Amino acid sequence: MEFKIRLATEGDAQAVHDIYGSYVPLDYVTFTVENPSVDHYRKKIAETLEKYPFLVAEGADKKILGYACGSPLRPHDAYQWNVEWTIMLAEDAPRRQGIATALYKEFAQLLALQGYRYIYGVLVDTNQASVALHKKLGFKEAGHFENAGFKMGKWRGILWYVKEIGSSNEPPKKPLSLSEAM
């Protein structure tokens, strides 16, 4: 399977919308109940790229096969060296072809260059494919919040996974913006 990893552009908003939207009706992938608009994703891509990577996997036919993006772990200043990531593959993207792994490797490499220390993944606890991916990538389970969300008539828990990608030298420097690191 031929594909490349690149930074997302606002022109990828429709594809990101469609990929994420395919998971919204499922109770075991995301707690989102209604998929936001394409314009929401256009803004999200632009705003994310100011600080964090927003990557897409693009097939040889230019179709977007998946994406990975970062967001703040928590709003408080002391958390600024941590990033929560989201990774999604298109419903029809081939599995076990290295797409998710390639997205992760590029994502983690960029975050490390920026000076981030930890990547966190927050998964619905019944999403075994995502659990397996995080374990394969070297993440460690950091917590389990039972019955954290209610969707489609069921309570679901979330699992927190974490991976250290930066050094633990003190005192840490403020992370660079994505453009400063590239």
Predicted regions and their residues:
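A short beta-loop-alpha structural element at the N-terminal edge
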Residues: K4-V16
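Conserved beta-strand-loop-alpha-helix junction that forms the acyl-donor binding cleft
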Residues: G121-V131
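Glycine-rich acetyl-CoA-binding "A-motif" of GNAT/NAT acetyltransferases
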Residues: K63-G66, A129, W155
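Conserved acetyl-CoA-binding loop-helix of GNAT-fold acetyltransferases
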Residues: R96-Q109, A132-K136
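Conserved GNAT-fold acetyl-CoA-binding loop/helix
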Residues: H17, G21-K44
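Conserved GNAT acetyl-CoA-binding A-motif
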Residues: L111-L123
